[in-house]
Amino acid sequence: LDQSSCMICFYRIFYPKLKVYVIHHHFRYQEMSGIKRQLQYMLEWLGLGVSFAIITPNPYTHSLIKQMRPDSRTVFLEMAFKKDVPTCSCYVLKQLLFVGTVYQRKGLLYLLEAIGQMSEKERSGIHLDIVGDLSQKKYYKCLLSLVHLYGLEDIVTFVGRISDEELRSYYSRAYCFVFPSLLEGYGMVLIEAMSYGLPVIAFDNSAIPFTVKNDRNG
């Protein structure tokens, strides 16, 4: 379950005078179901409860913490972000880009299904680059099966993990950033994509609406 919460409780039990500050990104219990979800919720509740203060980078997570632990010392401290915007625009029309670890929470299944349900005319010219770690082999194979099912072999490319320099080139030539994540505590990659002038298509859930504003930047 959550090792961080266990460690916080350990320090508070054996070092009661120690002030533990926690930087909290998102709640892991939201990714679970059944008894695991209940146990994880309890661990996070305990961990936050014995913390001296909690720092969080997003109003969404801040509100959840206050619901869980109304008496907690919680500070919303927005994440600093510095990124040089490219001076030239060399995007490729209909070039879509996703950046993030390839696993279930990122919702790529829904993105591939959406493209797969397009007509041949609507798909024409579209290409999707999926950039990110592919270590979750079971989920990766599931996505490959979906690509094969919909005949998207020439449309979808799994790039894998790349260097920062290579990533900049992918951002520079992308026409639109797509991010079908089901849960985000912040979604820094959204800010990164916007720094390249990319419009963002994303689900309206968790912390995402605090960054992506409909008809303004996505």
Can you annotate each of these PLM segments?
Residues L190, P199-A202:
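Short hydrophobic beta-strand element within catalytic cores of glycosyltransferases
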Residues G132, K141-I162:
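Nucleotide-activated donor-binding/catalytic signature segment of Leloir-type glycosyltransferases, i.e.
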Residues L182:
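Aromatic "clamp/platform" in nucleotide-sugar-dependent glycosyltransferases that forms part
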Residues K94, T101-Q117, L128, K138-K141:
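A conserved mid-protein helix/loop that constitutes part of the nucleotide-sugar donor-binding site
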Residues R161-I162, S169-A174:
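Short alpha-helical donor nucleotide-sugar binding micro-motif in glycosyltransferases
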Residues Y60, A80:
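Carbohydrate-associated surface elements
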